[in-house]
């Protein structure tokens, strides 16, 4: 509990707040809203699951990943099996062991701690594990998923900057791209912005076909 990283339970609890705040601003609880969350460690989107269980009318929670898409592969029925990590312009997602996904599995396996311990042992010993159909069904009930390639991420940064003068960090751009894939005009979709673009200046500038004054100012 000392480090305020994504596995810290206090951080997950704090993240619940902005699900309620943003949903209420768009009409909740009178209307449902959706959330797309760029994530590698599953902490931010797990906070959304808790918010949903607390009664927030969330239509869907969408996991957005980069090319290191172990979460997307898992949630689309291909098991949780690690592969070699490929360096990307969204480095916070360049992982294969998602530290908070164990918490989601715990609920998907009906609070069976012994079964989760076995899965974690398989992950340690064999680099992955398969998920039962029942658990996958439970996960799919709460979570959808999608991914964005490097080119799609760069194109999204460029498109949003050109259209609205908003400069996105690569992780947020992945969320926006995946949110577009899941867009339902009857239900508003909120994409969580995970970092300021100035945190990744080289990656952001390399994504742009041109360097705007806004990009220079924000990334300097």
Q: Model regions: which residues?
A:
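A broad detector of short, well-ordered amphipathic alpha-helices
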Residues: 46-49, 173, 213
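A generic alpha-helix structural signal
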Residues: 157-161, 204, 211
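Single conserved hydrophobic/aromatic residue that forms the stacking wall/gate
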Residues: 210-219
